[in-house]
Amino acid sequence: MKEIEYVQDLCSRAKKASKVLKQLSSSKKNKILLSLADLLEKRKAEILLANELDLKDGKEKKLSSALMDRLLLNEKRIFSMASAVREIAALPDPIGEVTRGITLPNGLELVTRRVPLGVVMVIYESRPNVTIDVGALSFKSGNACILRGGSEAFYSNEILIKLFHEILIKEEIDIGSVVFVDKTDRSFMIPFFQQTSLIDIVVPRGGEGLIRFVSENSKIPVVKHDKGVCNLYIDQDADPEKVIPIVINSKVQRPGVCNSTENLILHNGYPFRKELLEALAKEGVELLLDPSSLALYPKGKPVKQQDYLEEFLDLRLSVKTVSSLEEALAFIEKTSSGHTEAIVTEDLNTARIFTNSLDSAALFINCSTRFHDGGEFGLGAEVGISTGKLHVRGPMGLVHLTTTTTYVTGNGQIRG
C-alpha cells in the first residue's frame, strides 16, 4: 500500500468510528474501559515480554538511563495503568453536559452542550503508558484517536493496542476507535498532517525536535506538549524543613518526565545552600553550578548558559544563584518553557509577587513541580500538558477533548 493510501485508510477508519463513538452511552463506554483495565492486569505477562523486546533494543541503541526508565514497564506500572483507566471510567462523562441554557426574548430556546472533537491524533515518545492513557481518555470523551508512538516503544505499544482492540471487538465496537500507526519512519507522519477533513486536532508530546517538526508541517490545529524546563526558586525566607524534600522530589523521584525540575534557583540569603547541594549529590544528581554554588560545592561542574535552557530528563540539574526575587524572575523569563515554575518561601507577599509576575501553565507554592500532572490534578490522566494558550493550557483531560454545539429550538420564528 502506498504511503498516502495507508494514511488515508487509517484516517478514514477513525473518522467512521468517531461517528459511532459520539453516540455511545456513558455506561457502555465505562463498561469497555473497566474491561480493558481488567485485561491489562490479566495479560501482564504478555505486556512484559513485549516491553523486554523494547528494552533490549534500547540497550543496543544505548539509550540514556532516563529514556530507559520512561520506556520501562513492570508489574507496578502495569497495575498503575489499569488503575488510571478505572479512574477515567469513574469520571463524569463530559459529553452532553449543558454549558449554557437560555430562552431569548423572541422565544428561541438555546442549549449549548459538550460534544467530542471527533478524531484526535497524538504523537508521543518513549512512554508506553501514554498509549493507554490517551486511548482511554479519547474513548471516554467520545473521540476516535490515532496513536503514533515512538519507535523505541513499538512492541509495547503494539500489545497494548492489541488488548484494547480485543475488548472493542468483544463489545462489537469498531476498532477504528483506537488506530495504531505501525510505521515508525517520521516521513510517514507528514501525510497525516494534511488530512484536514479527517483529523480534528494533533497533539505532539515529546522533545523539542518533535514539537517543531509537527508545528511546521501540520495544516491541522496543533496543541503542543512542549518541553518542560521547570524552574524551582528557593527564597531567602524558605523553610529549611520543606526545602530539601521538595527539591529532591522535584528532581529525583522521576527525572525523565516533563514536570521534573531542571533549574534550581537559590537566593544567596538562604543559609542552607551547601547542605541542599550535598543532599542532591547524595541522591546521584549531577550538579551544574554557577560560580557562587561551585564555591560551596567544588565537586560540581561549571554550568554553561545553554544548560539553563535544556530539558535534561535525567539526573542533571542546573543551579543559579540570585540576590533578589527580581533577579530570579528575570532569570525565569529567559529560561522558562512555559510549563511549570515553583517557589519555596514563607513570605506570602513574595509568593504573590512570584505568581503574579510569571506566565506559565502552572505555578506552585511550597510543593514539588512533580504535581503538574493530570492524575494529580484530578483529571484521571492526561493527553499531555499543553504549554500553549489555545485550546487548552496545562494538563489536557477529558473536558479538553470536547468542543460545543448549540441547539436552537423555535416555533416558527424568523429574523426581522
UniProtKB/Swiss-Prot annotation:
It catalyses: L-glutamate 5-semialdehyde + phosphate + NADP(+) = L-glutamyl 5-phosphate + NADPH + H(+). Pfam families: Aldedh. Gene3D superfamilies: Aldehyde Dehydrogenase, Chain A, domain 1, Aldehyde Dehydrogenase, Chain A, domain 2. The keyword tRNA-binding does not apply. It is found in: Cytoplasm. Pathway: Amino-acid biosynthesis; L-proline biosynthesis; L-glutamate 5-semialdehyde from L-glutamate: step 2/2. One of its GO terms (cellular component) is cytoplasm. Keywords: Amino-acid biosynthesis, Cytoplasm, NADP, Oxidoreductase, Proline biosynthesis. One of its GO terms (molecular function) is glutamate-5-semialdehyde dehydrogenase activity. One of its GO terms (biological process) is L-proline biosynthetic process. Its EC number is 1.2.1.41. Signal peptide: none annotated. It is an enzyme of class 1 (oxidoreductase). Disulfide bonds: none annotated. Catalyzes the NADPH-dependent reduction of L-glutamate 5-phosphate into L-glutamate 5-semialdehyde and phosphate. The product spontaneously undergoes cyclization to form 1-pyrroline-5-carboxylate. Belongs to the gamma-glutamyl phosphate reductase family. This is Gamma-glutamyl phosphate reductase. The gene is proA.
